[in-house]
């Protein structure tokens, strides 16, 4: 009792005292320490996600599929709202690197693969593939997933599925893996060995109206063509050889690309880039050009479609010159494609197309002038480099067109307002000195169609007309 009274007196008197018991704060209850330790042990890596909760969710998934196996073989797996919600949480969690690694260590890919193989529920399949897709966003887990040959086989088979969300997640996962340099060769080899992949992608492009799916399939195909030229040659050759890919009237690769591009034109025009690039890549190999030329109707259809894009959608007269910066990724493959087709199909050049080519060079000149006036060369150096290929392609194509130009077409261009003094000077400045012959032919025609403009070009650029041309 005395000891207790002394302690009270010391505290009341603000004295620290000498007793060890009074030199420290009271210890927390032991159960709080244990709770904190348990929570730390249960956390996945540096996250707040619970290992126990994740184990429980995956266990419920396994149990649900196991129970389903005991029922009719053709029945759909019943996915409860609660389990679907929890699996979607796992899907989101898998975007965290610590969670992705933990799922890999816990053999979650094998569990998900088993569910995909046994499930007849499209939503469940979509979620499982989506989880794997998020896991593949990290290098180490992507490498591990790619080494699973069974998973690779199942994913390629899923390209033949008829559920758009599942197809979307499958394409996303494949594209993610193909973007990893370490594992891309593994996936390319698998795809080369599965001829059904080509027909599956063609079927999607030619029949689907799902914009997100068409965009992702286009990105996947463009990546495949960009990474493996031999695969591209094989697919375009097989599509036009009447062999196994065509036995069931399956669409060929060219018509499928065109059909998907038409679908996206109004829905998602920015997504046309990958389709235009894929078509342009086909013109860089002999097999691709042969397919376009031998099937003249398809080649002409591609020409007509891309001309419409250029003349009606891209880089229009009422657009500001800066539109060239926004649309350069679309314009570059489009013009390269048109240039290749023109030289092989000897297509007709309309006044509208000629006007579009001139306008691109005019907008480029105006952008360059504004950058110079604003002393902003440094800030636009990268953009100028990106535009270089577009301007060169446009100039080369325009040169070829001008060398074949007839007076009636030029007259139509002038009357429609596509060729003013400003646009003509801009175009000629881009064409010289590499394409002098084309400029001479233009000046020669202008001497009859618009003598004043002809004299301006002669004077400004010291160009003489070439009447013999």
UniProtKB/Swiss-Prot annotation:
One of its GO terms (biological process) is positive regulation of synoviocyte proliferation. Residues 30-39 have a biased composition (Acidic residues). SUPFAM superfamilies: ARM repeat (SSF48371). Coiled coil: none annotated. Its main location: nucleus. GO terms for cellular component: nucleoplasm. Keywords: Nucleus. InterPro entries: ARM-like, ARM-type_fold, Synovial_Prolif_Regulator. It is found in: Nucleus. It comes from the Eukaryota. Residues 1-39 are annotated as: Disordered. Belongs to the SAAL1 family. Plays a role in promoting cell proliferation in response to pro-inflammatory stimuli. PANTHER family: PROTEIN SAAL1, SERUM AMYLOID A. This is Protein saal1. It comes from Danio rerio (Zebrafish).
